[in-house]
Amino acid sequence: MTGAPPLVIVNPVAGGGRARRFWQQSAIACREADMKVDVVQTERRGDAANLAADAGDRLVISVGGDGTAHEVINGLLRRPAGRVPRFGALMYGTGSDLVRTLPSPRRPKDVPSWLEKDRWRRIDVGRLGSSTGRRYFVNAADVGIGAEIVRRAAVGPLVLGGTINFLGAAVVSLMVHRNSSVRIRADDGFVEEARVRTIAIANGSHLGAGMRIAPDARPDDGLFDVVIIGDFGRFEAIRHLPRLYQGTHVSLKKVRVLRARRLEVDATDPVGIETDGEPAGATPAVFEVVPAALDVLVW
């Protein structure tokens, strides 16, 4: 790679310390390959975004989970307009859904060749306007039960692993969460008022540590895949939960999929939102595609 060395932002607590240990081994591989990188560890929430915002035009690599990547991307995209930001992710967090859409090395010894190959994919990002202001997301957002699942998974035992942790949080949330009455407006004129379990606004294909929520989503087609999961009862939803991991839920009668560049969601009572596995306020909300916003280093 030419120019300034990449800035590597490591979240040392992501994945119960797995991200830190992965980078320690990767750093050894980079030194052995005579590859220079600048490394900094985060200490508190918000550090990753601030470091990325101040990184200039060089490649910024996130080492952590989806939440760390989410912060880095928001930092990159708040810089003044100019060159398209360059981003890479080494995923070792609780959920790590982004890597299912945008693969990166899983072995430390492969990190130097990943950097050396210099292969890029230009992708879209999502922009959310909600009760907490504006933020960007790269993988997916969720209006409804997803915010509850994220909250429960965040306090779950990491020793179980991301998928089991999120699955347990999903089952508990399904038992206590009440469906919401919402109004949905898409840019093609589609308008619907309905009771829903959740609405996924997907740029990537997965969320919730492996749920294949939008099987056909592509992060570079200029469109969200919007998956509306309707008025499922508690036990009905639990019975169909395995289909979310298989991606076959989209054939159910109470599930609707549409594609849109812009989506407005309002509700009778405020409904929680999560973006890339992070709490993101509540409805009313507007989601917009920002096309070709990010260059991602791919494996």
What are these regions (language model features)?
Residues 1-63, 109:
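ATP/NTP phosphate-donor binding region
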Residues 10, 24, 33, 40-42, ...:
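Catalytic core of DAGKc-family lipid kinases
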Residues 12, 63-65, 90-92, 203:
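Glycine-rich beta-strand-to-loop/alpha-helix junction loops that act as flexible
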Residues 43-46, 64-67, 93, 144, ...:
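Short beta->alpha linker loops
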Residues 68-80:
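Short Gly/Thr/Asp-enriched flexible loops that form oxyanion-binding sites at enzyme active sites
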Residues 142, 146, 200-215, 279:
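Glycine-rich phosphate/pyrophosphate-binding beta-alpha loops
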Residues 157-165, 207-209, 215-236:
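Gly/Ser/Thr-rich active-site loops/lids in small-molecule metabolic enzymes
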Residues 186-188, 193, 218-219, 228-299:
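ATP/nucleoside-binding phosphotransfer catalytic cores, i.e., glycine-rich phosphate-binding loops
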